[in-house]
Amino acid sequence: MYPAHLLVLLAVCVSLLGASAILPLPLNLVQFTYLIQCANKGSRASYHYADYGCYCGAGGSGTPVDELDRCCKIHDDCYGEAEKMGCYPKLTMYNYYCGTEGPYCSTKTDCQRYVCACDLQAAKCFARSPYNNKNYNIDTSKRCK
């Protein structure tokens, strides 16, 4: 074997070892996005909810700024309950359908049912809550105490 081949093989092995330490991405985020789109047909894109208020997006603290932000806090709390049940809500994949009357869950295990119900409840809550552009990308260090 040529020295260059050994170097390439070594580089691949080192890369794979490094990749094994990387945390997995939230797999059901895509499903949650589709549930939001199904519940909010013709409305704003789901990414508008990723940095809204004190609770929509990563983390959360303080008092929700409005009804929509309360939807996100309830969703966070629901995921917290799922974790207490031994579920991994950000990694749990589930089955759902987008019917003419909106999304609904159709899944088998307790964790899948619970996590899908959390996401479904949030998506429907988003659909009925007004969106205030002033609460998008707020300074959480000042407004979320």
UniProtKB/Swiss-Prot annotation:
GO BP term (any one): lipid catabolic process
Pfam families registered for this protein in UniProt: Phospholip_A2_1 (PF00068)
Position of the signal peptide: 1-21
E.C. number(s) listed in UniProt: 3.1.1.4
Annotated binding of Ca(2+), by residue: Y55, G57, G59, D76
Disulphide bridges, residue numbers: C38-C98, C54-C144, C56-C72, C71-C125, C78-C118, C87-C111, C105-C116
Catalytic center residues: H75, D119
Annotated cofactor note: Binds 1 Ca(2+) ion.
Catalytic activity entry: a 1,2-diacyl-sn-glycero-3-phosphocholine + H2O = a 1-acyl-sn-glycero-3-phosphocholine + a fatty acid + H(+)
Entry superkingdom: Eukaryota
Family matches, as PROSITE patterns: PA2_ASP, PA2_HIS
Co-factor(s): Ca(2+)
Keyword tags: Calcium, Disulfide bond, Hydrolase, Lipid degradation, Lipid metabolism, Metal-binding, Secreted, Signal
Protein family membership: Belongs to the phospholipase A2 family. Group I subfamily. D49 sub-subfamily.
Protein name from the UniProt record: Basic phospholipase A2 cL037
Taxonomic lineage from the root: Eukaryota, Metazoa, Chordata, Craniata, Vertebrata
